[in-house]
A protein has these predicted regions:
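Metal-dependent catalytic cores of enzymes that make or break cyclic nucleotides
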Residues: 39, 46-204
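Membrane-proximal linker segments that couple transmembrane helices to downstream signaling/catalytic modules
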Residues: 24-51
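Juxtamembrane or sensor-core-proximal signal-transducing alpha helices
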Residues: 2-32
């Protein structure tokens, strides 16, 4: 009788563990689905922001492509490249909180306006703080405007304090900015851009 009772208790514990495991799997699945939907929505928002200005249209896509080219030269594997590409599409997501009048201003920004636009790095990182599907996405979003000499923003990181993923995006972002036409300046040819990057090595 005692043995039967022990077997029943043991069976109950097994059943409870199975149910608990199934419930956890279901919760994990739902969380993943919610994150995937959130990422798709944010990518759409990022694309919408860029579409408002003909000069930045497609910027995130191009930065993602350039970043992958750089990372591939560094020997990254396909999983790492795919992750970097997905993260790059969101690097400017924080700009959804920046007024269009500042984002699309055709002339030089005032100090106050530049202070406002710098906030997009922190805003973007906060938006993505609960996203775990893409590795390093928060550090890319927060740190892609840091400079190697410590004069970047928002945290004034210097040298290797800046995460490698963010450093790659910074170079890709700079390349796209210089190769794109702007109201206030013409686009630069590839050889001139390479020279500019070389000249600023160790600072930007």
């Amino acid at each position: 009788m005692i043995l039967l009772f022990i077997n029943v208790i043991y069976t109950i514990h097994i059943i409870r563990d199975i149910i608990k495991h199934q419930q956890q799997e279901e919760l994990d699945k739902r969380k993943k689905n919610i994150e995937e939907m959130s990422l798709q929505l944010m990518q759409m928002l990022s694309t919408t922001i860029e579409a408002k200005d003909e000069y930045t249209k497609g910027h995130s896509h191009r930065v993602a492509e350039y970043s992958v080219l750089i990372a591939r030269e560094l020997g990254w594997n396909e999983k790492e490249l795919s992750n970097l590409k997905n993260a790059d599409h969101l690097h400017d997501i924080g700009k959804i909180a920046i007024p269009d009048t500042i984002l699309n201003k055709p002339s030089k920004l005032s100090e106050e306006e530049f202070s406002i636009i710098k906030e997009h790095t922190i805003i973007g990182a906060n938006i993505l703080k609960n996203i775990s599907l893409i590795d390093h996405v928060q550090e890319i979003v927060r740190n892609h405007h840091e400079r190697y000499d410590g004069n970047g923003y928002p945290d004034g990181l210097k040298g290797k304090e800046i995460p490698l993923h963010a450093r790659i995006v910074t170079v890709a972002d700079s390349y796209d900015a210089m190769s794109s036409q702007r109201i206030y300046r013409n686009q630069l040819p590839p050889e001139k851009i390479i020279q500019e990057l070389e000249n600023n090595k160790g600072t930007q």
